[in-house]
């Protein structure tokens, strides 16, 4: 524990007094301060000027990060017949129908993304209370209810990230690993911020992108200049 304490103190000292950094500065600081014995995820938190309790202020979407996430994504697909075969051929980890529904109902959720063909939604719909809170419910708006299951599986495994605003108006996501080159992390951050910016809902009033912070899994966060985080 003493070593962990020293590393934590050192990281906090490195971050002390540093606010509103450029994306490049923030990424460099996070990479230099990362000290865990595993490849930490670089995480982004965005405070948005929305109240997601109102339907016209909900923010959700999907973005393909140019350099991937560095994470192995486990994909489940609800499909039958030829579409099930397509999903398996594309690399889906779990493929099923009612049998997969029963597995999930039993509490066994061993996947990070869930995809379904439209005809399977009556089955998937019974899992709303389980999949919904985990942001795993297939949704046509983010391309996870589709007949092109092969492409959806490839997208999920190729660095596509879904995002959805939480009750407090915050969006969290992983945008890479600390082992990534700085330039690749910067590209990923800007791609993610731009996707959220483009998903601005009609009901949003005032400042939309309010605050942005970056951190590593085990490290403290640092605030990032909003203008710097935009690729535009």
UniProtKB/Swiss-Prot annotation:
SUPFAM superfamilies: Ribosomal protein L1. GO terms for cellular component: cytosolic large ribosomal subunit. It comes from the Bacteria. Keywords: Repressor, Ribonucleoprotein, Ribosomal protein, RNA-binding, rRNA-binding, Translation regulation, tRNA-binding. PROSITE patterns: RIBOSOMAL_L1. GO terms for biological process: regulation of translation; translation. GO terms for molecular function: rRNA binding; structural constituent of ribosome; tRNA binding. Binds directly to 23S rRNA. The L1 stalk is quite mobile in the ribosome, and is involved in E site tRNA release. Protein L1 is also a translational repressor protein, it controls the translation of the L11 operon by binding to its mRNA. Belongs to the universal ribosomal protein uL1 family. Part of the 50S ribosomal subunit. NCBIfam families: rplA_bact. This is Large ribosomal subunit protein uL1. It comes from Ruegeria pomeroyi (strain ATCC 700808 / DSM 15171 / DSS-3). The lineage of its organism: Bacteria, Pseudomonadati, Pseudomonadota, Alphaproteobacteria, Rhodobacterales.
């Amino acid at each position: 524990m003493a070593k962990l304490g020293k590393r934590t103190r050192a990281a906090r000292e490195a971050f002390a007094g540093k606010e509103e950094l450029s994306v490049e500065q923030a990424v460099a600081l996070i990479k230099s301060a990362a000290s865990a014995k595993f490849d930490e995820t670089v995480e982004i938190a965005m405070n948005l000027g929305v109240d997601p309790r109102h339907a016209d202020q909900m923010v959700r979407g999907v973005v393909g990060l140019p350099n991937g996430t560095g994470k192995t994504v486990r994909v489940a697909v609800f499909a039958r017949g030829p579409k099930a075969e397509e999903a398996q051929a594309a690399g889906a980890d779990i493929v099923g129908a009612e049998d997969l529904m029963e597995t999930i109902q039993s509490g066994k959720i061993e996947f990070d993304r869930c995809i379904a063909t439209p005809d399977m939604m009556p089955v998937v719909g019974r899992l709303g209370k389980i999949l919904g809170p985990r942001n795993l419910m297939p949704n046509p708006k983010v391309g996870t209810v589709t007949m092109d299951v092969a492409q959806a599986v490839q997208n999920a495994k190729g660095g596509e990230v879904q995002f959805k605003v939480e009750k407090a108006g915050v969006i969290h996501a992983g945008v890479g690993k600390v082992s990534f080159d700085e330039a690749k992390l910067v590209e990923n951050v800007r791609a993610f911020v731009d996707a959220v910016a483009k998903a601005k809902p009609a009901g949003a009033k005032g400042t939309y992108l309010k605050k942005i912070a970056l951190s590593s899994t085990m490290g403290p966060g640092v605030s990032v200049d909003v203008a710097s985080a935009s690729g535009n």
